[in-house]
Amino acid sequence: MQIHSLKYPLIELKGVNVTFAQKTILSDINLTIYPNSIMTIVGPNGGGKSTLLKVLLKLLPATSGKVIYSKNVVIGYVPQNIYLDKSLPITVEKFLSLRKGTHKQDIKDALTLLSIGHLRLNAMQKLSGGEMQRVLLARAILNKPNLLVLDEPTQGVDITGQAELYQLIKQTQQQLNCAILMVSHDLHLVMADTNEVLCVNQHICCAGSPEAVSNDPVFIRFFGNQFAKNIAFYTHHHNHKHNIHGDICCGQDFRSTQCKHKIN
């Protein structure tokens, strides 16, 4: 019996395909998101990562296949970025209050949790990249989600702030007791806490623990041998592993498939 056979999935994708104008964007995607897990999606630009998130968020219908949601799943979403009209200044508090059913205390609590209470009355247009991402994260947790979906959460954040932001995301996950699904190229920063990595290029090319994926030939062809070695080094020095459900377990890999794509 698997360690977490009693945990019910938050979301399951079964044989999901997405096509536009007879062009395949996603092919035969199968994945399961469990409570309290952290799953990171990597892959080349144009490989379908953002499309996969849109399907999960019900922003785009799958051409075929099934997307099954737990009846109690509550999703918070952090996009890569948002467009704000500079001619219409708006404070952080006003921006967050645009979410239906939000109360001032909810806003204060979210900002306090993310250590940005001092930004409450600041203009959104004057925020730095890191501050903006924290505000978007605050907006995502207003509905107290049990699944946070993050699309390149360090977009627009300088290098020194990226590790700090990922640490804040991890702390938020622990506070909310939620799962995280994120698209990220910063695997060297998130790998210690990631339970499963999915490498997506139209289909799932390889998947498993960060250490397992870093040794997969497909991953190495995508990201380079030195980058893969760095990931393997970091994971080797992490003092334990987690399975995809978030539990400490003995060394084991999950799944790895041979990618049909050729990479020049």
UniProtKB/Swiss-Prot annotation:
PROSITE patterns linked to this entry: ABC_TRANSPORTER_1, ABC_TRANSPORTER_2, ZNUC
Pfam families referenced in this protein's UniProt entry, alphabetically: ABC_tran
Catalytic activity line of the entry: Zn(2+)(out) + ATP(in) + H2O(in) = Zn(2+)(in) + ADP(in) + phosphate(in) + H(+)(in)
UniProt keyword S-adenosyl-L-methionine, yes or no: no
EC number from the UniProt entry: 7.2.2.20
Main subcellular location: membrane
Membrane topology: Peripheral membrane protein
Alphabetical keyword list: ATP-binding, Cell inner membrane, Cell membrane, Ion transport, Membrane, Nucleotide-binding, Translocase, Transport, Zinc, Zinc transport
Residue ranges of every copy of the ABC transporter domain listed in the record: 11-226
Biological processes per GO annotation: response to zinc ion
Protein residues bound to ATP: G43, P44, N45, G46, G47, G48, K49, S50
Subcellular location: Cell inner membrane
Any one annotated GO CC term: plasma membrane
Keyword Transcription regulation annotated: no
Molecular function per GO: ABC-type zinc transporter activity; ATP binding; ATP hydrolysis activity
Enzyme class: translocase
Protein task: Part of the ABC transporter complex ZnuABC involved in zinc import. Responsible for energy coupling to the transport system.
Subunit annotation: The complex is composed of two ATP-binding proteins (ZnuC), two transmembrane proteins (ZnuB) and a solute-binding protein (ZnuA).
Family under the similarity heading: Belongs to the ABC transporter superfamily. Zinc importer (TC 3.A.1.15.5) family.
Listed name of the protein: Zinc import ATP-binding protein ZnuC
Taxonomic path: Bacteria, Pseudomonadati, Pseudomonadota, Gammaproteobacteria, Pasteurellales
